[in-house]
Amino acid sequence: MDEKVTIVGAGPAGMAAAIYLQRAGLAPVILERGAPGGLLRSAGLVENYPGFPDGIRGVELVEKIKRQLRKVGARITKANVVRVAPSAKGFAIQTDKRKFTTQAVLIATGTSPKGIHLQGPASVLRKKVFNEIIEIPGRVYGKKILIIGGGDAAFDYALNLEGQGANVTIITRSAPHCLRLLQERVKVRQIKMITGARPGFLKGSPKGLILQSRMGGQQIETAGDLILLACGRTPNLDILSPDLRRRLASRTDVPRTGVQGLYLVGDVARGNHRQTGIAVGDGIRAAMLAQDYLDRRLTK
């Protein structure tokens, strides 16, 4: 089957692009392997998005975007995209369910967490270490949560979880590198911080877990119930064929890529500039560029 335009990923960028393209009559195929919303689902209070003077919780904003998506008639298909490659008709997309071609494709796959080298029993690492808030099972009320990281995400996670009744400790290898506003809020909430520690070994305990870290030449131990990692992100570009990855141009003109009909939108292209407003703008601009591209193909 030959589709006109396909969107891989249903975070804010992908959904914004889908709304525009659906209203333009292009009936985009929207593929998402998980739950729509991306990292926005883990955000505590979103305050940089216009229209919400008191801020809005990430999960609430996701639901509003999903409602708008449904209202225009767009539908998200649950599928895991394993490869996007060039084809005579534009691009060939292989999912875990089918293979099809598309004339244009928007890559809105977001980012994946960077891991850190934590040693310990596999059962403890598998059951007690998480990369996103939404992965944590059950309620967090009363739980001792150790957050490893010193950026905006780590501090936002801390405020979010503390607001849900968790006992949070932030562990950073160096001085925090996040918004001063977030640091001030963490201080006001009296969230504990351990600065200058290098986590290394994790072991289970009768009451949860113990994280061993090196700090100032000494070993310290911090007890908790679970660990949440917030140590940076890396773009999800593995689904692009080697040929397409080689052909990607400098990302100074995002969402263009240098490959006709291929667009990178949102966090996957933005490095450290990960904001919902930027992602939404990228999605809409990519949708407009894709529409222009498809119109030109029709006139040839």
What are these language model-derived features?
Residues 2-4, 78-79, 141-143, 196, ...:
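Phosphate-coordination loops involved in phosphoryl transfer and adenosine-cofactor binding
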Residues 3-72, 153-180:
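Beta1-alpha1 glycine-rich phosphate/pyrophosphate-binding loop at the start
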Residues 69-95, 99-102, 163-252, 292-300:
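A Rossmann-like FAD-binding core segment of flavoenzymes
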Residues 76-87, 91-95, 103-135:
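Glycine/small-residue-rich loop that forms an oxyanion/phosphate-binding "nest" at active or ligand-binding sites
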Residues 108-109, 115, 148, 230-231, ...:
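Short, well-ordered coil/turn residues at beta-beta hairpins
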Residues 111-152, 156-159, 164, 250-253, ...:
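Glycine-rich dinucleotide-binding loop and its adjacent helix/turn
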Residues 123-139, 226-278, 282-292:
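FAD-site-proximal beta/loop scaffold in flavoenzymes
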